[in-house]
């Protein structure tokens, strides 16, 4: 249980990677059938998740915000942790303490330079 928490909450400690033939591998999930199996993660740390999430932030989400649009992001918990870490500039050493409640929208008000002016949960 302690080791699982370390894998789930640390920034740069990944869990053991799945073998490609493992039945839990994402290559066997229908929703990924149109994605090159070589790019599907077999497990990842939050650091690795950031490497996947931040290009999407920069290429898809940030431009919409700069156009003045409101953007709703619904994602897996670790993807949200990666995005919140980036937006709030949370140091790696503090990331194990970041709690993101399930099903509770978090609002980010952004400045023109895309820094966070304020954030809060709708409750």
State where each predicted segment sits.
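Short glycine/proline- and acidic residue-enriched helix-loop micro-motifs
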Residues: 3-48
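Short alpha-helical linear motifs
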Residues: 31-33, 73, 99
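Short, well-ordered beta-to-alpha junction loops that form the rim of enzyme active sites
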Residues: 9-12, 68-70, 74-78
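Acidic, low-complexity terminal tails and accessory targeting/binding regions
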Residues: 3, 17-20, 42, 46-47, ...
């Amino acid at each position: 249980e302690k080791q699982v928490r370390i894998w789930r909450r640390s920034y740069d400690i990944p869990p053991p990677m799945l073998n490609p033939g493992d039945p839990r591998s994402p290559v066997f999930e229908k929703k990924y059938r149109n994605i090159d199996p070589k790019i599907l993660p077999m497990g990842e740390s939050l650091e690795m998740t950031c490497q996947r999430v931040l290009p999407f932030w920069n290429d898809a989400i940030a431009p919409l915000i700069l156009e003045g649009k409101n953007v709703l992001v619904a994602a897996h918990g670790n993807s949200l942790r990666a995005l919140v870490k980036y937006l709030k500039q949370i140091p790696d050493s503090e990331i194990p303490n970041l709690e993101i409640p399930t099903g509770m929208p978090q609002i980010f008000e952004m400045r023109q330079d895309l820094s966070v002016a304020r954030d809060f949960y709708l409750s």
